[in-house]
Amino acid sequence: MRMWELLPSKIKYGISTIISIIVFLFFLEFLGQPVLKSVSYTITTITILAFIFGKYLWKYFYIDYLKHKFCPDFNGRWIGKIESNYSGGTKVEFPLEIKADFFSIKMKGNTTIGRTYSNYCKVVRAEDDSFELVYMFKVFNDTPSITDTSFYEGAARLRVIDIKTMNMKGVFWTNRCWENGKNTAGIIELSKEV
């Protein structure tokens, strides 16, 4: 979820340093390993612990206070609603899934025309201290018409309106049929399924 990036530097580096020192002293003093081996074992141990915690264990320690003050939990199934400038205001509703961990966030969904994926997602703090989900996506159009394209990309920026319900609203834009001046943009809303 790139939550790691939202941590204040003092906390981020303080926790890493304290855990590294404890692990190093464990190998050096308790197990009696030489200094270089203790350093090597410490690096390996910290890497493994960070991976396990960042991918799996963080969910069990992520309390509501952290969701409100640090970063919301974006994991789950969502309903996306877009209102596009295409053909005078096309409205589309589609399901999507967000998978997030401490270090990354990915999205995938099925639209009325095909599939959409997003591997570049980032959670940022806006100027007003609210949370925003910013991402780039690609869409594979399984049934393109003669005036459409089979693949296009886009970007979106959504503001978390309410952390408890995880409702988000924002804007999107695409390069869909840009060669013909028909690229699209509009409003997007995401609502988390309960």
Curated annotation (Swiss-Prot):
Cell toxicity relies on the transmembrane domain; its replacement by a SUMO domain prevents cell death in cells also expressing DncV from V.cholerae. The C-terminus forms a minimal, eight-stranded beta barrel that probably oligomerizes. GO terms for biological process: defense response to virus. It comes from the Bacteria. Keywords: Antiviral defense, Cell inner membrane, Cell membrane, Membrane, Nucleotide-binding, Transmembrane, Transmembrane helix. It is found in: Cell inner membrane. It is a multi-pass membrane protein. This is CD-NTase-associated protein 15. Residues 1-73 are annotated as: Required for cell toxicity. The beta barrel domain oligomerizes; in the presence of cyclic nucleotides (probably 3',3'-cGAMP, but the cognate CD-NTase makes at least 4 other cyclic nucleotides) higher-level oligomers are detected. The chain crosses the membrane at residues 15-35, 43-63. GO terms for cellular component: plasma membrane.
